[in-house]
Amino acid sequence: MDRIINILKTLDRPGTDKVIEFMEENNYKGSRCYGHHKYAGGLVDHSLEVYDHMMQNRGKLPKDSIIVCAFFHDLGKASKSTRQIKDHEGRSVRLLDKCGFPLTAQERNAILTHHQIEGFLNDPLRKCLSQADIDSTGRWKEANDPNYNSSLSNILKNIGLKFISKLCKVFVSESYL
C-alpha cells in the first residue's frame, strides 16, 4: 500500500489527499477482488499489477492518467465488508467525485467501461486499462479450449485484434497508441 500512496502523491490534482484518506479508512489495503485476487490484500496486488502493465504499455498516454486508471478503476471495491460490491465501476467514479477529485473525460470513460468491449478500439487509455485488467485477472482462461480459442480468435480478428492463446492476451496494433 505504501507504494500506491507514494505514487498517488505524485499527482497534482485536488482531492488526492481525500481519496488516499478514503482508501485508508475503507480498507483498500485489506480488500479483496471477486473472481480473481480473492484474498485479503488482493485489491492492492491487482492494482499494482495493472499499474505496472499500463506503464510498460502506455505509449504516449499521460502518466497521470495511467496512475488514475490503474489505482482507481476498482476503487469502488474498497470496503470494510467482505461482500461483493455491485457496479464497482460506477461506485469508483462516484467516490472520486465525492472526494472532489477531477477526472478527464477519457479517464472517466475508461474507469466506467473497462469491462466492456464496445468502443474498445476508439480510446487508447481505455484499451490500455482493459488490457492490463485482463492480464492481471486472468480472464479468458477458456483460451485453453481449442473450440473457444478458434471462435474468439475469429471474432477478435474481425474487429482488428489478435488473440494469442499461449499468453492469454489480446494485443492491439501499436498504431492505436
PLM region spans:
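Metal-dependent phosphohydrolase cores
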Residues: 1-177
